[in-house]
A protein has these predicted regions:
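A generic local secondary-structure boundary/capping motif
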Residues: 43, 137-138
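Structured beta-strand/loop patches that form or line metal/cofactor-binding pockets in enzymes
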Residues: 16-64
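Intrinsic disorder at enzyme termini
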Residues: 2-22
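Subtilisin-like serine protease catalytic core
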Residues: 130, 140-141
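Metal- or metallocofactor-binding catalytic centers and their adjacent structured scaffolds
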Residues: 22-25, 40, 59-132
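Structured loop/turn residues at beta-strand edges in well-structured enzyme cores
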Residues: 35, 116, 144
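Hydrophobic faces of well-ordered beta-strands that scaffold small-molecule active sites
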Residues: 64, 144-148
Length: 148
């Protein structure tokens, strides 16, 4: 591969996330393996403090759930991210992370909290589709029980 064949990675001025054209063909999954995000729903659950739940829905009639803290602001941010994620494949979590990092750099903890809930929901979708617990997707079980 020559230097001219390399993908275009650029560091934004002042640092930040390397830029890559997410429209490049190499960043897409083959159509026969496609599943798409169709909607993102958010809900707040009151308790000692407010928890946020994010539901990522797909065209395969499978949905995933993720949770977040800082519910009001993070849920608002997750709702705004829906526009960027509709049509994306929830199995491509690295691609989704890069896409959201590019578009939402500078949103701080709120942006990270929103993304983490979406990412968790995508892993939940993977677990359901592959019929394995999410901990298996993340490297396996570490322990069988914990002290409470």
């Amino acid at each position: 591969m020559t230097q001219d064949d390399q993908p275009d990675y650029r560091i934004p001025q002042g640092g930040g996330v390397p830029w890559r054209d997410m429209g490049m063909e190499e960043t897409h999954r083959p159509p026969e393996r496609d599943i798409e995000i169709t909607a993102i729903e958010t809900m707040a659950i009151a308790g000692n403090f407010t928890w946020g739940i994010v539901k990522v829905e797909t065209d395969a009639d499978v949905y995933g759930l993720g949770e977040t803290f800082r519910a009001e602001a993070a849920l608002d941010m997750a709702g705004r991210m829906e526009v960027d994620l509709e049509g994306e494949n929830p199995l491509d979590t690295d691609r989704i992370r890069e896409l959201l990092e590019q578009r939402y750099t500078g949103t701080g903890r709120i942006g990270q909290a929103a993304f983490t809930a979406i990412e968790t929901a995508c892993y939940d979708i993977k677990g359901k589709l592959f019929d394995v617990p999410v901990y298996e997707l993340l490297g396996g079980k570490y322990r069988d029980e914990i002290k409470i």
